[in-house]
Amino acid sequence: MNGQVIKTIGDKYLVKNNLGKTYSCRLKGNFKIKNIRSTNPVVVGDYVDLSFDLKEIMIVKLLPRKNKIVRKSVNLSKRTHVLASNIDQALLIITLDEPVTSRSFIDRFLVSAHANNVNVVLIFNKQDLLSKELLKKQAFLKKVYQKIGYRVLCVSFLNDDLSMLKEIMKNKLNMISSHS
């Protein structure tokens, strides 16, 4: 049987099959050493094959990914850290104040997403906190990213903008990310 990983906690994986039933699973012992160049071989979004043992349910095979979001592993320079896979879109939450999301963080995220065939929606949050100067900076960044093909939204989640976000996410497997 196979299913999709919907949650990971330590060495436990929650996998949902196509009938909607969920299973708590672990990785088969030798799974982690099979030519995998990432720090985490199985991530949320992965499709996996399961084996039912008398004691527990094991993930025995990782099925091919249609896409993934990766970052460089912090301590292991030649390895990557996969954040999610098989996603329909990534939502990158950006703040220009309290705290500031750096332009380099945004660009690194976009490069990784583009290289791995993931659509990204940029969401500038905390509109209610922005000064006139920061609103100008946001307008500039919005124009830059729209010009190169990204959908950009400016919101304040304190207001009624959550309904807009729910509509964007509707019927899609989404990854939400920010700098912290």
Language-model regions: role of each:
Residues S104-N119:
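Histidine-anchored nucleotide/phosphate-binding helix
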Residues I87-I94, N117-Q127, G149-C154:
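Conserved beta-strand/loop subsegment of P-loop NTPase cores
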Residues G45, A113, N125:
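Residue-level signal for inorganic ion chemistry
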Residues L96-P99, Q127-K132:
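Short histidine/acidic/glycine/proline-rich micro-motifs that form metal-
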Residues L129-S180:
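Canonical P-loop GTPase G-domain recognition
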Residues G10, V111-H114, Q146, K170:
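Signal for well-folded cores of large energy- and translation-related assemblies
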Residues M1-R103:
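N-terminal accessory targeting/assembly segments
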Residues T8, T95, N125-K126, F157, ...:
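Cofactor-binding loop segments of dinucleotide-utilizing enzymes, especially the Rossmann-like FAD-
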